[in-house]
């Protein structure tokens, strides 16, 4: 049994005493110490991203005791929720079932794999309304899929929601004991001064390595343990297989087939010069009406990220998106490398130069999503395309990514001439810099954006 973050997280635990996801920085310590207004914390995230470890570690560090309930491994506990879901009743049941005293502020209650028990999810409403003094955290791997089912009564407005993503490159650097390198990268991102060439090359190698290993804790742990390349590949394949298993477990037969078909089409979708999702690449005659639900399932499961097209630059970007045109990206680089059979040696060879660009764009999509940005790209009459648009305060910033150091981009120039943004971002293997309104951001520093 792999303990997904045991060896990793202790190395930089003090640097991550908060969950940094979504549009806010939600500090778990602040949540614990809230005097009023605290609601149960509900953590979304793909399978094996580290949710269970985060919750149990938080309980061990900041509470006198923890009551851990896993609705997937213990079906019996879920039956008690069929009778009553008011908070006082649930507290009494948990105390008897686990033979432990639950004390407000001193006990953390964890509901794991809560999507397996509809009534437990609904009970969070009563913890929020009736007994806010109790500290409750819940999570589920397929939570996004589960709450989309009609039968679920989701506690709208009664929970604090947060999303966990795979470890980003900065977190992996921390895990490797390279905090000074990550700090230096952040410093040079801010001042736009080139990084020392030796450090620049070291950081680029870390980027290439990350593109293959990814950010799933099990894969990072195997990499840190210096497991053989075969063992590391097997772990990434295991993670991929767990995603595939979920497709059969949490969807009906018809939906499962279509989910598989969409997922299997992703390499071909991304290999095109124009990466807009095309249904015909799933199979001949495929239509949005047939496969829309399958795409939504993959998004809700945290397996893919969706990037919407915009043909205008105006703020807010989401108001001008074209819902019929989008791209899909893998949500983890290690899963992607396992799916396409990419190795570090192949990634750095000239034979895979074209696909290196695909990996780079997918990597940037993951990094932006992890930092809380909604994903959008810009296209103008099929003649010019900018990889990403991001909103920073009230500004819309175009982002172009290149796998190498050849950075001439006609589309970016078209965009800048048309909309005159405050500045643009170009991501490539080039060092930090700022010239002609374009901020040069090395590939390894996207976590700074």
Show the residue positions of the predicted features:
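Conserved lysine of the Walker
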Residues: 51
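Short glycine-rich substrate-engagement loop in P-loop NTPases that contacts/grips substrate
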Residues: 73-105
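Structural recognition of the conserved hydrophobic beta-strand(s) that form the central parallel beta-sheet
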Residues: 110, 135-141, 163
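Accessory nucleic acid-recognition modules appended to NTPase machines
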Residues: 216, 220-390
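Conserved catalytic cores of phosphodiester-cleaving nucleases, focusing on short active-site segments
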Residues: 364, 368, 386-405, 424
């Amino acid at each position: 049994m792999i303990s997904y973050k045991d060896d990793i997280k202790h190395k930089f635990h003090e640097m991550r005493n908060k969950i940094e996801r979504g549009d806010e920085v939600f500090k778990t310590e602040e949540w614990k110490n809230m005097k009023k207004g605290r609601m149960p914390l509900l953590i979304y995230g793909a399978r094996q991203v580290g949710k269970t470890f985060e919750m149990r570690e938080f309980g061990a560090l900041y509470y006198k005791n923890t009551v851990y309930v896993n609705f997937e491994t213990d079906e019996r506990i879920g039956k008690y929720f069929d009778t009553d879901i008011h908070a006082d009743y649930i507290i009494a049941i948990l105390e008897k079932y686990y033979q432990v005293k639950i004390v407000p502020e001193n006990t953390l209650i964890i509901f794991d794999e809560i999507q397996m028990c509809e009534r437990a999810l609904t009970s969070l409403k009563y913890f929020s309304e009736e007994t806010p003094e109790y500290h409750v955290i819940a999570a589920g791997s397929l939570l996004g899929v589960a709450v989309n089912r009609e039968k679920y009564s989701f506690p709208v407005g009664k929970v604090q929601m947060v999303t966990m993503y795979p470890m980003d490159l900065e977190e992996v650097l921390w895990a490797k004991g390279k905090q000074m390198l990550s700090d230096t990268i952040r410093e040079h991102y801010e001042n736009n001064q080139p990084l020392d060439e030796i450090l620049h090359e070291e950081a680029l190698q870390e980027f290439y390595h990350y593109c293959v290993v990814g950010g799933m804790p099990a894969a990072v742990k195997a990499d840190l343990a210096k497991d053989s390349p075969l063992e590391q590949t097997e772990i990434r394949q295991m993670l991929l297989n767990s995603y595939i298993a979920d497709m059969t477990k949490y969807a009906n037969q018809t939906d499962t087939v279509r989910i598989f078909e969409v997922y299997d089409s992703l390499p071909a979708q991304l290999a095109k010069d124009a990466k807009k999702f095309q249904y015909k690449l799933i199979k001949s005659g495929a239509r949005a009406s047939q496969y829309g639900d399958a795409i939504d399932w993959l998004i809700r499961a945290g397996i893919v990220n969706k990037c919407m097209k915009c043909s205008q630059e105006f703020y807010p970007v989401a108001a001008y998106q074209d819902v019929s045109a989008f791209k899909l990206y893998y949500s983890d680089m290690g899963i992607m490398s396992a799916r396409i059979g990419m190795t570090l040696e192949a990634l750095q060879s000239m034979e895979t130069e074209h696909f290196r660009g695909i990996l780079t764009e997918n990597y940037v999509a993951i990094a932006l999503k992890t930092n809380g940005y909604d994903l959008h790209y810009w296209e103008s009459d099929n003649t010019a395309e900018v990889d990403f648009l991001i909103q920073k305060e009230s500004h819309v910033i175009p982002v172009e990514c290149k796998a190498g150091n050849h950075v001439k981009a006609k589309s970016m120039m078209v965009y800048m001439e048309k909309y005159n943004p405050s500045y643009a971002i170009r991501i490539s293997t080039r060092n930090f810099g700022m010239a002609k309104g374009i901020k040069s951001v090395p590939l390894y520093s996207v976590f700074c954006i």
